[in-house]
């Protein structure tokens, strides 16, 4: 993609777009919430559908000229239903947070109670953090992982639910490396008459491929984003039983959003179609294997992992034991200098600030898309360890940067 048309009218933006393409090709994207979509998805997202207003739903729009918008949305919905086995799917949310908003608006009144996973223990802002709309509209209490194991404590969660009597329990995570037992959370919700929303934003692709247990058919609502492990472009999705369909649809539009982003929905349709190919199951399995290999190799280098490992696409490193004087922010910055891009992250029982926390979160979806296998992931883990163990050593940085450049050349993303 040369951006010739952009360069003709706006060379500054063209330079930025070209620079970003080179950055993605020439660095290792290890932020757990990022991935590389296909050229086909990008082409769909840059289509003429960006020009089309299509308020409403297929067959019931508030504008004319929506026949092809209807075709695209119907394809996206049908493919999502096939992927996840869901009764009802809404593909209009602009993001995972918008999907969560749709569920809240469909089911809760201001002041209702939500029980969700604490942000520093792996939750997400939209699950009720005070800085987020959910924390401002609803009464929120939060459960935590077990202090010893770093894993969800389902018995403690149930006891918390019994005491708090929430209207909704939110499950799911942004930085929890273990498989979630949805049925146990559903049982806690059933015991107090609460609804259960499972947010699978990070593991949408793993669930679709059978690499993580599915909450579809267990939880009342399943939300997610479409640009992390499933590679369908930026956006959100809501799945539910048919009984909730009308409430969800009206909460998304007109409740929370106006016109849907039809060009993004086209990207979702294409990405979901790609995920229906058997090769996607192989990809998802490799994502999980690569994360396990990455974690094990880092442990061999003396690093401590939250929960002791991973079952998913991400590894959460707690630096306090191995490198107590180094923050996650320090590591993030130094690794980016050598071409490894990840993010600082809070860890359970965080002792630093959220702006400069004690951990780093590392994901494997994007590198797996590029073709990285277990051997390559061991090399990446070695590079990460060398930089952290030798913070500030420019000779080490130069050597690691050369290794990263070789890996990028060996596994190109966008030709």
Swiss-Prot record:
- Cellular component terms per the entry's GO annotation: cytoplasm
Q: Does Amino-acid biosynthesis appear among the keywords?
A: yes
Cellular localization per UniProt: Cytoplasm
Write out the entry's keywords from A to Z.
Amino-acid biosynthesis, Cytoplasm, One-carbon metabolism, Pyridoxal phosphate, Transferase
Q: Which family does it belong to?
A: Belongs to the SHMT family.
Question: Whom does it interact with, and what assembly results?
Answer: Homodimer.
**PANTHER family the record matches:** SERINE HYDROXYMETHYLTRANSFERASE (PTHR11680), SERINE HYDROXYMETHYLTRANSFERASE 1 (PTHR11680:SF35)
For this entry, the protein name equals: Serine hydroxymethyltransferase
Instruction: Tell me what organism the protein belongs to.
Output: Halobacterium salinarum (strain ATCC 700922 / JCM 11081 / NRC-1) (Halobacterium halobium)
């Amino acid at each position: 993609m040369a951006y010739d048309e952009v360069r003709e009218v706006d060379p500054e933006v063209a330079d930025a777009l070209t620079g970003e393409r080179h950055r993605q090709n020439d660095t290792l994207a290890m932020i757990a919430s990022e991935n590389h979509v296909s050229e086909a998805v990008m082409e769909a997202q840059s289509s003429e559908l960006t020009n089309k207003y299509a308020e409403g739903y297929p067959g019931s729009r508030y504008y004319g000229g929506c026949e092809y918008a209807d075709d695209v949305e119907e394809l996206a919905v049908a493919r999502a239903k096939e992927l996840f086995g869901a009764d009802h799917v809404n593909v209009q949310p602009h993001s995972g947070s918008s999907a969560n908003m749709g569920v809240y608006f469909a089911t809760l009144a201001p002041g209702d109670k939500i029980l969700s996973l604490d942000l520093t223990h792996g939750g997400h802002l939209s699950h009720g953090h005070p800085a987020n709309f959910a924390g401002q509209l609803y009464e929120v209490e939060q459960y935590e992982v077990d202090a010893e194991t770093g894993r969800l404590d389902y018995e403690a969660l149930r006891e918390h639910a019994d005491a708090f009597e929430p209207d909704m329990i939110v499950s799911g995570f942004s930085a929890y490396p273990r498989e979630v037992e949805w049925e146990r959370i559903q049982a806690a919700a059933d015991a107090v008459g609460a609804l259960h929303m499972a947010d699978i934003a990070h593991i949408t692709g793993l669930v679709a491929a059978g690499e993580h247990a599915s909450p579809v058919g267990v939880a009342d609502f399943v939300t997610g984003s479409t640009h992390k492990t499933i590679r369908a472009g930026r956006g959100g999705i809501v799945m539910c039983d048919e009984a909730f369909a009308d409430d969800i649809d009206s909460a998304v539009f007109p409740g929370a959003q106006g016109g849907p982003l039809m060009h993004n929905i086209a990207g979702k349709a294409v990405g979901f179609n790609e995920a229906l190919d058997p090769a996607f199951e192989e990809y998802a399995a490799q994502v999980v294997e690569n994360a396990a290999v990455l974690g094990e190799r880092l442990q061999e280098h003396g690093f401590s992992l939250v929960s002791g490992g991973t079952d998913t696409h991400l590894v959460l490193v707690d630096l306090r034991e191995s490198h107590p004087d180094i923050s996650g922010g320090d590591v993030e910055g130094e690794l980016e200098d050598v071409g490894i891009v990840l993010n600082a992250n809070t860890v359970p029982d965080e002792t630093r600030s959220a702006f400069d926390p004690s951990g780093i979160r590392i994901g494997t979806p994007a590198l797996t898309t590029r073709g990285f296998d277990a051997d390559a992931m061991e090399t990446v883990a070695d590079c990460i360890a060398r930089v952290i163990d030798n913070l500030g050593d420019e000779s080490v940085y130069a050597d690691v940067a050369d290794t990263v450049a070789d890996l990028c050349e060996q596994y190109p993303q966008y030709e």
